Amino acid sequence: GKDAPYVPGRDCHGLPIEWKVEEQYRKKKLDKKAVPPSEFRAECRAYAQKWVDVQREQLKRLGIMGDWGNPYLTMQFDSEATIVAELMKFAEAGNLYRGSKPVMWSPVEETALAEAEVEYEDITSTQIDVAFEITESPIAELVGAHAVIWTTTPWTIPVNQAIAYGPDVEYVLWADALGIARFLSGTGNKMPVAGTRYLLIAEPLLLEFLDRTNDGIGRLPGAGLEHFGDPVQPFKWRGKGSDLAGTVARHPMHHLGGFYAKPRPFLPGDFVTTDSGTGLVHMSPDHGEDDFLLCRANGLEPVFAVMADGRYRDDWEWLGAGDLDEYGKERRRSVINKPFNSPEGPICSDLREAGALLSASDDYQHSYPHSWRSKAKVIYRCTPQWFVPMDKELGGGGTLRSRAMSEIERVRFIPEKGRRRIGSMVEGRPDWVLSRQRAWGVPLTCFVKKGALPTDEGFLLRDPEVNARICEAFETEGADCWYAEGAKERFLGDGYDAAEWEQVFDVLDVWFDSGSTHAFVLRDRADGTEDGIADVYMEGTDQHRGWFHSSMLQACGTMGRAPYRNVVTHGFTLDEKGNKMSKSLGNT
């Protein structure tokens, strides 16, 4: 046989530990933000060590044999030094960048989350149809008509900047003579509803829209769609989405002026489909990946109106006055707050008052992302973060995505379906967001030039000597030395004016920690492997988007190859409801 020593290991950084320490603070009515980072980190380290000790003794009592006197912990000084060294390989190669783009964001934890830190749950949300008045168009019939958008995130309407259409989608201008006008007439809106109002909508979705708005009056039994609304006249206009180029609408809250008085252009989006909704998609570059890319390509930038805790900025125009009255309090709730988005909430109330709310119901069932730790809903939020690019050309050829996809084909997966699972995830994933706005973790050890833009040459300091000083200090003192007084001057050394540089205090995604284990366990330990490659990685199927995934990306980025030859995936023992058993769910 062959010697296969078991090296016990623990991931020690991250949100689960912080969450427990913060719970202790809350019981004592302490504010975490008032505690110095070094003190908070010391408490997190002590908490993690306590449970490392408890679990070690429990596993030994079970008769599990391993190198208990020499485990690996991601919070050990040498581990933290290696993790930083691996990060600096990305930085020095030009494969680390700072950018602003929508990322998964937890308003409860006030940090960005990776896909592996998100769980999807079935929920019921508010769905609304909103009318945007068309003010300009090369098609005369559209001027004065209303474009209809559908959304399940009413809270994003105050930061709408455009409307997307599908170039190949068939659209119609429907004469709304009875149903919705009748609906609006009982809402106290300010817009006159007498006479016919024309609504622009994708033809394949008109029936669905009419069902959603409970408009059965305008239909003729057995008649074609062209007779909806007005039994005498056909649609006022019918055409392809590509005909809508140059069309402009105005925001339903345009009366507020400022941001809301700006025109809302119609933009072509290849992501617009007729699967659901209205075939017209409201665009907010702050809160959606497609929105961000399409708007930025057309000169529309994020406005950063939603803060880290999920509330609109106090100076945002939609909030208006009345900080202390009920009107003001209602608008200062977190956007994930259910009443905030309800048909009776502030968004819908304002749209109803403007005569723009065509339907509102809180009965839409769908799958929605939640934080794996707090179990609270997450949002897409545009924030400055640090990323590893998936599609940038790497030295030696290929991209991180193409390298990983190639290595996935070489690795043996047991069962075989694991290859397809991880492959589909890598193939479609966005750039890897590495930064977290938390305290307990390996710091993202970067310095950036004051006053420079992320796109400027020299924005990020890529000096191997500076990086070596950081790694040497971490090896003997641990990552806490990054937070010590005078750390910036110490690490920059005599070659740089510390006043010209800013020190980054974000921490690394914990999946980068665990993804680096091949370096500080397999490569660096005396009992590791000669080539730094594991014969087998074995974990549950959830790790196709976790440890297997991050390890593959990390190793392909620094070594150009997979860190393992075989991946074995096991199943889970489930509870009586079919849920995975875990301490956080309380079902173990």
Description of each model-found segment:
Residues 4-15, 171-173, 180-186, 193-251, ...:
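Carboxylate/His-rich catalytic cores and anion/metal-binding grooves
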Residues 425-430, 438-447, 485-489, 502-511, ...:
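Catalytic cores of enzymes that engage adenine nucleotides and/or redox cofactors via long glycine-rich
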Residues 182, 195-197, 201-205, 210-224, ...:
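Glycine-rich (often Gly-Gly/Gly-Pro-rich) flexible segments and glycine-rich loop motifs
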Residues 257-267, 503-532, 565:
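Active-site-adjacent "gating/activation" loops or surface patches in catalytic cores
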Residues 121, 283-286, 499-506, 528, ...:
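Conserved phosphate-binding loops in nucleotide/dinucleotide-binding enzymes
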Residues 2, 18-158, 177-178, 183-189, ...:
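Residue patterns forming the tRNA-binding/recognition surfaces of aminoacyl-tRNA synthetases
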Residues 289-296, 550-559:
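Alpha-helical support elements that line or immediately flank enzyme active sites
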Residues 91-123, 220-235, 244, 250, ...:
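Amphipathic alpha-helical
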